């Protein structure tokens, strides 16, 4: 169970160093292949809430990439209605076994803070983001206030 050993080590590192933008990490010690936590973005329009994500690691980790799902709804061109995310670092063709979970999380936070309309999962939102940023930000902020999780205060 090489995956479990590596994940235990990575989890300890993340908890020891702390990540400002990834909080409330929950992992069942009996099953290290599923992590949950809160993404806490810095940039508007997403800084009005937090977003629960789930990271599912395959048994073949680190030789196969983890899968990330947003459990909190988000108005974002790179994240679809089912919570699936288009994140190049964890795509099968780009994945490298040396990539660590904290790097994946940092990439995810960067994507949430700075949408990439050229790689959309939701073409309508990418178009709105590109053509009418003000309208997009207003809609995304309202959506975040309505569906987002409460941000940790500490």
Swiss-Prot record:
Catalytic reactions of this protein: S-ubiquitinyl-[E1 ubiquitin-activating enzyme]-L-cysteine + [E2 ubiquitin-conjugating enzyme]-L-cysteine = [E1 ubiquitin-activating enzyme]-L-cysteine + S-ubiquitinyl-[E2 ubiquitin-conjugating enzyme]-L-cysteine
Alphabetical list of SMART domains matching this protein: UBCc
All residue ranges annotated as the UBC core domain in the record: 2-149
This protein's UniProt keywords: ATP-binding, Ligase, Nucleotide-binding, Transferase, Ubl conjugation pathway
InterPro entries, sorted: Ub_conjugating_enzyme, UBQ-conjugat_E2_core, UBQ-conjugating_AS, UBQ-conjugating_enzyme/RWD
Role of this protein: Catalyzes the covalent attachment of ubiquitin to other proteins.
Entry protein name: Ubiquitin-conjugating enzyme E2 L5
Molecular functions per Gene Ontology: ATP binding; ligase activity; ubiquitin conjugating enzyme activity
Pathway recorded for this protein: Protein modification; protein ubiquitination
Record GO biological process: protein K11-linked ubiquitination; ubiquitin-dependent protein catabolic process
Protein species of origin: Homo sapiens
Active site location: 86
Enzyme Commission number, as recorded: 2.3.2.23
CC terms in the record's Gene Ontology section: nucleus
Family label: Belongs to the ubiquitin-conjugating enzyme family.
SUPFAM superfamilies hit by this protein: UBC-like
Alphabetical list of PANTHER family matching this protein: UBIQUITIN-CONJUGATING ENZYME E2
């Amino acid at each position: 169970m090489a995956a479990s050993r590596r994940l235990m080590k990575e989890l300890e590192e993340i908890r020891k160093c702390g990540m400002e933008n990834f909080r409330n990490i929950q992992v069942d010690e009996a099953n290290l292949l599923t992590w949950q936590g809160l993404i806490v973005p810095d940039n508007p329009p997403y800084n009005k809430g937090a977003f629960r994500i789930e990271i599912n690691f395959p048994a073949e980790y680190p030789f196969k990439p983890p899968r990330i799902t947003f459990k909190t709804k988000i108005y974002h061109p790179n994240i679809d209605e089912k919570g699936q995310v288009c994140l190049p670092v964890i795509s099968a063709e780009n994945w490298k076994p040396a990539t660590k979970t904290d790097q994946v999380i940092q990439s995810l936070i960067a994507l949430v803070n700075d949408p990439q309309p050229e790689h959309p999962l939701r073409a309508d939102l990418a178009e709105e983001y590109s053509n009418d940023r003000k309208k997009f930000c207003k809609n995304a902020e309202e959506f975040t206030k309505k569906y987002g999780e409460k941000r940790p205060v500490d």
